[in-house]
């Protein structure tokens, strides 16, 4: 059992990010954005190895590698590309009410969910869809809405790591992981006084 507490000596990050919002009509607003990111550890020789990885860095000079080199790798939770687009529709009905519909789509490339770059803990690229339908007063005083998040029920790995003591106690590799919420559907009511 052992843990290494260390940090990268240096890293390089570069990228491009853009956001936009367009009132396409009196009733439709389109929003979107994207980010392209290039992250690389330029010097990270003292990384904690995941269970089962072959160490490749000898820091104490005794001829036996103890740690893993992550030089040249990207960082945890960093995807090369992310993008989103949303459509917000607001249409007056009757004399004082309004119907609203909001649809958004989010996409991200794959990324490592583990700080030790365990290949068992890579989140594949995914697309997430969300929607909101509402009816309310045009003045904004009240509104009722139905919300649906993660309509395609994506299982998104947000963090993971080696299970402590699993290798020494049971002699087998084991991981723990945290996932974002699956599909959720809810009702929302708003009254402003």
Describe each PLM feature range.
Residues 1-4, 46-56, 117-123, 160-170:
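Flexible, surface-exposed loop regions and adjacent strand-edge segments
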Residues 33, 46-47, 100-102, 117-118, ...:
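Composition- and surface-driven signal marking solvent-exposed, interaction-prone regions
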Residues 106-114, 135-193:
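C-terminal beta-signal and adjacent terminal beta-strands/loops
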């Amino acid at each position: 059992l052992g843990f290494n507490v260390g940090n990268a000596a240096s890293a390089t990050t570069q990228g491009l990010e853009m956001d936009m919002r367009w009132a396409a009509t009196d009733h439709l607003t389109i929003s979107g954005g994207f980010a392209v990111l290039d992250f690389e550890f330029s010097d990270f020789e003292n990384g904690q190895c995941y269970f089962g990885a072959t160490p490749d860095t000898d820091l104490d000079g005794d001829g036996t590698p103890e740690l893993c080199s992550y030089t040249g790798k990207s960082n945890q939770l960093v995807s090369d590309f992310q993008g989103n687009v949303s459509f917000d529709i607001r249409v007056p009905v009757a004399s004082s009410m309004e119907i609203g519909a909001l649809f958004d789509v989010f996409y991200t490339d794959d990324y490592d969910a583990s700080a030790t770059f365990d290949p068992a803990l890579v989140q594949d690229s995914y697309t997430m869809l969300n929607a909101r339908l509402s009816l309310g007063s045009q003045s904004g005083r009240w509104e009722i809405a139905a919300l649906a998040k993660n309509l395609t029920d994506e299982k998104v790995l947000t963090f993971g790591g080696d299970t402590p003591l699993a290798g020494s106690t049971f002699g087998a590799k084991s991981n723990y992981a945290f996932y974002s919420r699956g599909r959720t559907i809810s009702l929302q009511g708003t009254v402003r006084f």
